[in-house]
Structures are given as structure tokens and as C-alpha cells.
């Protein structure tokens, strides 16, 4: 079961492939999660670029600056591309750190999983009980469900960038839920994953 309508996610995926041919970027957000998990697809496209690539993006799209959210935005019909830049955007972890921490995955440069998890937890703590927050929460579950290799890295990131409150928020929300069928977790499977996540993250 998808979180967004298939027509929207298909358009978004096709636009992401076109974008990948035009500029260099590091993929974050829902589509990065999808490439790791093959779980829920995304509607919006979230990328990190340097200022040189931002100039190239402006040649291909109409780009606007969102001063309030510290990002740039490009749009193609109903598909939005959110663009984050070093020394400007504020997303919990410095973008200049993130832009140098990617792997190659299915033809894309994708943020490393441990950083993606931490980034998702940070964003979830802001969006909370909204539809986008719900999607963030499900994405985090999917990432843990596919096994996290570098748990030490996650704990280090949490401490280095003072994300303790955001992790507590996530764990409290995790404790409230009893299932997440959108990502294939019935009550028994959810309880087991919750126990695993708590074992990895609590008091570390």
C-alpha cells in the first residue's frame, strides 16, 4: 500500500531520473529511503547541492528561495524539488557534512544510511503529527527494518549534533504505536522491531 497516489509518485520518480542527468546532487528524504528499503515511494524530491549545481538547476527549472525554511524550491507541475545548500540550510546536521557523506546506489548519490536516519528523526521531530510527519516516521521504521549496519555512527551523530531531544521524541512516538501496516508491520512484527530499536538507541 502506498502513502501517496501512484500517479504522483510515478511522475516524481521520472522527474528524479531526469534531474539526475542534469546536475550532481546527494539524494536525501523519501526517495533516498526508498532506494535503501524499496518501501514507500515519495512525492517530493529532496536534494543537497553546492552553489555551482544550484546555478545549473536554475537553468532547467524556475527556482525560488524560501528564506523562512532556509532552502530553495523548484517545481515541475505538482512535483516539488526541495534544495538544501551548505552554510545556508538548517536541517539538524550541517549540510557541508552531509554533502560529503554519500554512497552510489542504483545510479544515484544517496546519503549514507546512518545520516539519513538521523536526518529523518530530526525532521520528524519538527513535523510531528502531520501527514508529512507520519511519512517520516514510517520511513524511519523502514530504514531500521532493513537493518542498520553502523549503529555506532548513529549514536555518534546524535551526540555530535545534539539530537538527544529529537531521538527521545521519536522513541516516545514509537512507543505509542502498536502497528505500522503501511510498511508491512503487523502488531507482532512492530513490537519486535520496537524492541530492537529501543535496544539500539535507548541510553546510548
Where are these regions (language model features)?
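Compositionally biased terminal segments of proteins
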Residues: 1-204
Amino acid at each position: 500500500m502506498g502513502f501517496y497516489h501512484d500517479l504522483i509518485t510515478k511522475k516524481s520518480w521520472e522527474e528524479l531520473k531526469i534531474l539526475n542527468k542534469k546536475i550532481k546532487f546527494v539524494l536525501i528524504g523519501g526517495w533516498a529511503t526508498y532506494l535503501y528499503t524499496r518501501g514507500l515511494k515519495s512525492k517530493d524530491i529532496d536534494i543537497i547541492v553546492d552553489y555551482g549545481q544550484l546555478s545549473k538547476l536554475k537553468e532547467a527549472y524556475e527556482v525560488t528561495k524560501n528564506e523562512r525554511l532556509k532552502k530553495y524550491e523548484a517545481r515541475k507541475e505538482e512535483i516539488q524539488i526541495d534544495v538544501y545548500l551548505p552554510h545556508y540550510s538548517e536541517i539538524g546536521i550541517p549540510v557541508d557534512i552531509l554533502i560529503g557523506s554519500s554512497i552510489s546506489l542504483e545510479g544515484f548519490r544517496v546519503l549514507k544510511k546512518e545520516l539519513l536516519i538521523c536526518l529523518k528523526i530530526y525532521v520528524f521531530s519538527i513535523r510531528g503529527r502531520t501527514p508529512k510527519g507520519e511519512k517520516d516516521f514510517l520511513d524511519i521504521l523502514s530504514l531500521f527494518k532493513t537493518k542498520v549496519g553502523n549503529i555506532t555512527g548513529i549514536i555518534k551523530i546524535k551526540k555530535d549534533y545534539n539530537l538527544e531531544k529529537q531521538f527521545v521524541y521519536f522513541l516516545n512516538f514509537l512507543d505509542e504505536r502498536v502497528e505500522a501496516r503501511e510498511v508491512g508491520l503487523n502488531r507482532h512484527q512492530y513490537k519486535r522491531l520496537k524492541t530492537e530499536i529501543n535496544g539500539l538507541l535507548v541510553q546510548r
